[in-house]
């Protein structure tokens, strides 16, 4: 990590020759374009997919600068309340350089369940997250209804994503079995971009060229449906978050969306006592946009070093070395392993 102060710098240094590798949306790879015909075919396929993505996107500039400032002040109030521990347990989800605040409905990511992967996401039980604040209805949702963006009564889930410079969210599709379409988002604090069809990889961290790079301006509304919502992933790249940025995501949950039962939770996050302790510690952490991502990147570097070790060294590992690096977005670090559930494994944690 020496010499790097931001994920964006590490990305740039790790992919100086990325033009030599091209990826199609169906996952096949071709190294080096062998002829003009190959290049033409590649461009045609990329352009065709970009047109399909665009067909499912609508954007509008609805909020004035004054309205943005008022809403941004309310977002700051949400952050302050979360830092004081005033929200319910599952309302707040923290990750390096990105915090999420769930209102109305909250849901687990696949990695928080014993059975992991796409399609395993579940809504929390009713009442597990705080209600949608009145100001979200009055300042945001009602304005979108007035402009015909969404019908009245559509939204029952509001999520605020608060990014610091260099923050990101990996490529994903909003769970189809959880949320109706469209997916509506409103951007605040600064301009950014939404990218479609990226291969977002770690170890080392790198992001491929997107099928479509969609600028999103402060105060703009973005609506995803059809191909853009269901048939291609979208992400926020570290290099596209140059200043603090927040987005309010407004969705409607499906009537038949599955909900959690206690048996579905990973053992490491079941204990109410343990969750209470984590909440108290978490609420007093100070945001440090220059440092919060450093353990994440250092662990990636350590993983590369560990892979170079001989099999003999791995066989004689006494279990006291650090565990393989896990994606920081999967879950809170202190909740990944506990002495109660994994007494023979130990993780060295860094505090800020």
UniProtKB/Swiss-Prot annotation:
Main location: nucleus
Gene Ontology terms: biological process: membraneless organelle assembly; mRNA destabilization; mRNA processing; regulation of mRNA export from nucleus; regulation of mRNA processing; regulation of translation; response to hypoxia; spermatogenesis
Stretches with biased composition (Basic and acidic residues): 18-34, 286-306, 315-343
Record's compositionally biased regions (Basic residues): 272-285
Cofactor note text: Binds 1 Fe(2+) ion per subunit.
Region: Disordered, residue numbers: 18-47, 260-352
Cystines in this chain: 198-235
Gene3D superfamilies: Alpha-ketoglutarate-dependent dioxygenase AlkB-like
Residues given in the record as Fe cation binding sites: 172, 174, 234
Top EC group: oxidoreductase
Assembly and binders: Monomer.
Domain notes: The C-terminal disordered region undergoes liquid-liquid phase separation (LLPS) for the formation of paraspeckle membraneless compartment.
Protein name, as recorded: RNA demethylase ALKBH5
Native organism: Danio rerio (Zebrafish)
């Amino acid at each position: 990590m020496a010499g790097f102060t931001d994920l964006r710098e590490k990305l740039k240094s790790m992919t100086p020759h990325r033009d030599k590798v091209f990826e199609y949306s169906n996952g096949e790879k071709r190294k080096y374009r062998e002829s003009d015909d190959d290049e033409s075919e590649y461009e045609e396929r990329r352009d065709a997919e970009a047109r399909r993505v665009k067909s499912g996107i609508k954007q509008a500039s609805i909020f004035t600068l004054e309205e943005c400032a008022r809403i941004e002040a309310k977002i700051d109030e949400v952050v302050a309340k979360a830092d004081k521990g005033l929200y319910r347990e599952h309302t707040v989800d923290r990750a390096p350089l990105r915090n999420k605040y769930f209102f109305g409905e909250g849901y687990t990511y696949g990695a928080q369940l014993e059975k992991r992967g796409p399609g395993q996401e579940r809504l929390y039980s009713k009442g597990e997250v705080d209600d949608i604040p009145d100001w979200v209805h009055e300042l945001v949702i009602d304005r979108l209804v007035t402009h015909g963006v969404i019908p009245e009564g559509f939204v029952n889930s509001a999520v605020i994503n608060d990014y610091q410079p260099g923050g990101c969210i990996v490529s994903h599709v909003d769970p189809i079995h959880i949320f109706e379409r469209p997916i509506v988002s409103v951007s605040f604090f600064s301009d950014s971009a939404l990218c479609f069809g990226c291969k977002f990889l770690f170890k080392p961290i790198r992001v491929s060229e997107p099928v479509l790079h969609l600028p999103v301006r402060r105060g703009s509304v973005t609506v995803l449906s059809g191909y853009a919502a269901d048939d291609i992933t979208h992400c926020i790249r570290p290099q596209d978050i140059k200043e603090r940025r927040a987005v309010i995501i407004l969705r409607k949950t499906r009537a038949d969306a599955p909900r959690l039962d206690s048996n579905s939770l990973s053992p490491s996050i079941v204990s109410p006592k343990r969750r209470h302790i984590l909440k108290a510690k978490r609420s007093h952490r100070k945001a440090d946009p220059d440092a919060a991502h450093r353990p994440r990147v250092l662990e990636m570097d350590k993983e590369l070093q560990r892979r170079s070790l001989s099999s003999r060294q791995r066989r004689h590992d006494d279990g006291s070395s650090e565990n393989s690096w896990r994606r920081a977005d999967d879950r809170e670090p202190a909740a990944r392993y506990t002495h109660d559930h994994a007494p023979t494994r130990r993780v060295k944690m860094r505090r800020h």
